[in-house]
């Protein structure tokens, strides 16, 4: 099993898909890494040679990508700083509402959580 950036990649997936299991690497970055490492995108993770694994590791290190824990920490610190300066976005984060301008009158249930029951009109 290939281990890159501290993550075990799934053996049965193509390497271009397997790399996206690392937090901070999406499709485009995975393709760039493989192109620079000289590895085909169609190779399965289980079929990688140790030389190919080393080339991928070296390329990921060389690109200076923030991955996994560092990236998660950076995102949470950015959100925390928005909340501390009481910006509009920070307030929306604190209240658990959509941050990017979506309407909340009818939708936004994912962000707001389950609907709270309101007592109906008595007959």
UniProtKB/Swiss-Prot annotation:
Region listing for Disordered, in residue ranges: 93-123
Q: Which SUPFAM superfamilies match?
A: S13-like H2TH domain
Molecular functions (GO terms): rRNA binding; structural constituent of ribosome; tRNA binding
**Basic residues compositional bias: what residue ranges?**
108-123
Does this UniProt record's set of keywords contain Transcription regulation? Answer: no
InterPro entries tied to this protein: Rbsml_uS13_C, Ribosomal_uS13, Ribosomal_uS13-like_H2TH, Ribosomal_uS13_bac-type, Ribosomal_uS13_CS
Which keywords, in A-to-Z order, does the entry hold?
A: Ribonucleoprotein, Ribosomal protein, RNA-binding, rRNA-binding, tRNA-binding
Q: Which Gene3D superfamilies does this chain map to?
A: 1.10.8.50, 30s ribosomal protein s13, domain 2 (4.10.910.10)
Return any one Pfam family short name: Ribosomal_S13
**Gene Ontology terms: cellular component:** cytosol; small ribosomal subunit
The highest taxon in the source lineage is Bacteria
Gene Ontology BP annotations = translation
Provide the function of this protein: Located at the top of the head of the 30S subunit, it contacts several helices of the 16S rRNA. In the 70S ribosome it contacts the 23S rRNA (bridge B1a) and protein L5 of the 50S subunit (bridge B1b), connecting the 2 subunits; these bridges are implicated in subunit movement. Contacts the tRNAs in the A and P-sites.
Q: Which PANTHER family match?
A: 30S RIBOSOMAL PROTEIN S13/40S RIBOSOMAL PROTEIN S18, SMALL RIBOSOMAL SUBUNIT PROTEIN US13M
Q: Which family does it belong to?
A: Belongs to the universal ribosomal protein uS13 family.
Q: How does it assemble?
A: Part of the 30S ribosomal subunit. Forms a loose heterodimer with protein S19. Forms two bridges to the 50S subunit in the 70S ribosome.
Please state what the protein is called: Small ribosomal subunit protein uS13
